[in-house]
Regions:
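Amphipathic, oligomerization/interface secondary-structure segments
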Residues: 1-105
Length: 105
C-alpha cells in the first residue's frame, strides 16, 4: 500500500469504521454522511500534504480542529474494532474518553 495516498487510506479507515463514527461525525457536521466523510478526508489530506511539503501558505481553519478530533476518535475506533470490540461499546468508550455530549442509541 506504499503507492496509496494518505487521503485514500483515511477514506478506507472511515468506511471500515463508519458505523462507530457516524454519531460523532453527525454531531459535528451538517449534511449527508458520505459527503461529510469525503470532505473531512480531503481537508485532512490537504493539511497533511501542506505539512509534509513545508507549505507556509497552509490555512488552518476552525473546521480542521473538528476534523482532527474525528481522526483522533477514528484511531481509537480502528484499534478497538481490530480487537473485535462491539460497535456500541466502542462508541460508549469514545464518548466517555473524549467527553462527547451526544446520546448513543
Amino acid at each position: 500500500s506504499h503507492d496509496v495516498g494518505f487521503g485514500e487510506r483515511l477514506k478506507t479507515a472511515m468506511a471500515e469504521c463508519r458505523a462507530v463514527m457516524e454519531p460523532f461525525i453527525k454531531s459535528r457536521y451538517d449534511g449527508a454522511l458520505d459527503v461529510t466523510i469525503e470532505e473531512i478526508c480531503d481537508r485532512m489530506n490537504t493539511v497533511r500534504n501542506g505539512i509534509a511539503h513545508s507549505r507556509l501558505d497552509l490555512n488552518l481553519e476552525a473546521v480542521h480542529l473538528s476534523d482532527l478530533k474525528i481522526i483522533e476518535e477514528l484511531l481509537y475506533a480502528m484499534r478497538l474494532q481490530h480487537l473485535r470490540v462491539d460497535t456500541k461499546s466502542i462508541q460508549i468508550g469514545i464518548k466517555r474518553l473524549f467527553g462527547e455530549r451526544i446520546s448513543i442509541e
